[in-house]
């Protein structure tokens, strides 16, 4: 199973959100509101980082 993360670039923030992609979007949105940008991603077995999407703070 894939483990999804919400990350904020240029910080140490890397939140594990488990195995359900749907659970990641609310956390991603909240972190984007606080830090300006956040991204939902996962890591392949070879270590490659795969981005599923992101939010920007445009409010």
Tell me the role of every PLM-derived stretch.
Residues 9-11, 22, 29, 45, ...:
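Intrinsic-disorder/low-complexity regions
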Residues 18-42:
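A short, charged, amphipathic alpha-helix used as a generic interaction element across diverse proteins
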Residues 33-59:
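Short, mixed-charge low-complexity intrinsically disordered segments
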